[in-house]
């Protein structure tokens, strides 16, 4: 990433842009509100502004850093499909720091992860709770990791209903179906039995990184990045 001074020098000397205009642009690009969203990338000139998450996509990295809803799920599914079309043999990495969210939206991400050809590695960078924990353990076996102070939490699906008694019964049956699906998924990827997952998930079941490894939610705890 280039510095503000280097960018200004290039714009004025090489592109003939006046200093006033450059200063206005630079104040926008390097302002506090932009620091976490964009980077300035140099690739054989000219410089270009790139959304930081788009830049990570170029390295086949997807970031799930918010609650899971339909909007986020659609984006992640589209990113997975796009990266598969770009290279069906190269791994994809999903970094997860999420409290969970919609089970239906999360299952869409899960099914896409299992459907595409590239191996999907999952890395927890802070918290993977509820539906996010399901996605974490659903990564390629041997490629599921978490940082040292990662927290992983599993529990039974949450839901509610109102209206006529028959409608409430229908909703309750659907929640029970989702519960079984989620427990089957966790059991399949963690190596635990369905009964163990059912018992542990009756209430919020929190695990630190090493406990998540012992449980089978991840394969390795990352403490120091290995030099390239």
Q: What are these regions, as identified by a protein language model?
A:
Residues 1-228:
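Terminal-region recognition feature
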């Amino acid at each position: 990433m280039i510095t503000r001074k280097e960018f200004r020098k290039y714009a004025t000397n090489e592109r003939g842009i006046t200093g006033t205009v450059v200063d206005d642009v630079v104040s926008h690009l390097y302002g506090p509100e932009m620091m976490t969203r964009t980077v300035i990338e140099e690739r054989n000139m000219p410089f270009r502004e790139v959304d930081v998450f788009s830049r990570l996509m170029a390295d086949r990295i997807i970031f799930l850093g918010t609650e899971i809803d339909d909007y986020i799920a659609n984006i992640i599914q589209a990113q997975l499909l796009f990266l598969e079309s770009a290279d069906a043999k190269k791994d994809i990495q999903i970094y997860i720091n999420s409290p969970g969210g919609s089970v239906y939206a999360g299952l869409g991400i899960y099914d896409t992860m299992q459907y595409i050809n590239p191996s999907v590695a999952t890395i927890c960078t802070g918290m993977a709770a509820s539906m996010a924990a399901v996605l974490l353990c659903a990564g390629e076996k041997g490629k599921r990791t978490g940082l040292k102070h990662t927290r992983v939490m599993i529990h039974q699906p949450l839901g509610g209903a109102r209206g006529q008694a028959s409608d409430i019964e229908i909703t309750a049956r659907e929640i029970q179906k989702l519960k079984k699906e989620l427990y089957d998924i966790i059991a399949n990827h963690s190596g635990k039995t369905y009964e163990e997952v059912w018992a542990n998930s009756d209430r919020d079941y929190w695990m630190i990184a090493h406990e998540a490894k012992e449980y089978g939610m991840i394969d390795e705890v990352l403490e120091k990045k290995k030099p390239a």
